[in-house]
Swiss-Prot record:
Alphabetical list of HAMAP family matching this protein: RecO
PANTHER family registered for this protein in UniProt: DNA REPAIR PROTEIN RECO
GO cellular component assignments: bacterial nucleoid
The species this protein was found in: Bacillus licheniformis (strain ATCC 14580 / DSM 13 / JCM 2505 / CCUG 7422 / NBRC 12200 / NCIMB 9375 / NCTC 10341 / NRRL NRS-1264 / Gibson 46)
Residue ranges of coiled coil: none
Gene3D superfamilies noted in UniProt: Nucleic acid-binding proteins, Recombination protein O, C-terminal domain
Similarity annotation: Belongs to the RecO family.
GO biological process, one term: double-strand break repair
Keyword set, alphabetical order: DNA damage, DNA recombination, DNA repair
Function, in words: Involved in DNA repair and RecF pathway recombination.
Protein name according to UniProt: DNA repair protein RecO
Amino acid sequence: MLTKCEGIVLRTNDYGETNKIITLLTREHGKIGVLARGAKKPNSRLSAISQPFLYASFLFRKSSGLGTLEQGEMIESMRNIREDLFLTAYAAYIAELIDKGTEEKKPNPFLFELLLQSMRRLNDGTDPDIIANLIEVKMLSVMGLYPELDECVHCKSKDGTFHFSIRDNGFICHRCFAKDPYRIPLSPASARLLRLFFYFDLSRLGNVSVKQETKDELKRVIQTYYDEYSGIYLKSRRFMEQMDNMKKMLGDENKS
């Protein structure tokens, strides 16, 4: 049976000499895999729509296992991402996170819109660190993880200075600091952003300017939390970190 849907290319894998298996996140069907015959050939009609991060309309032949891609029509190429190595690193990380954090053939329109908005924001020049952090935090509930970000995990206080307790799964206020000597320090700005990322709709995000110190705090908390609770390993994380370090080095050289 032929099925038409909109989807975003999460990843591609070579299959044989000329074919590709394309993993798509679709609004209607969730995450699916389709076989694109001949897509490795440069002149193939399926080659252009088999590119990572592409947003397109796909026509495929559905089956109980792997579907077969018949044709497609590009909606948005996300060209700026694919032409920029730094943006490619962030997009690959976000795509792999959503890929690893979701099951196949389970429709999730929220997740589809989240991925689409994140790719659009990266493509349009929004700070990639902020986009990556926001997606990381948004994905927690998708994976069944719910850190306490509204009040202190111990005394339930909603005011004061908050740090983050990995052990106790959430914010810990200054009155309870002694209960976790290994808590991760947070500035008020970082605490606000963590809460904002968890609840805020990405489509409403404007131009955000965040200090590097705040970014570093967010990165430490989020990555430590993922390492402790998520149970997933992302190959693209190392690539993203390498690109991030390279960007910082280039920035330091330009200042000197």
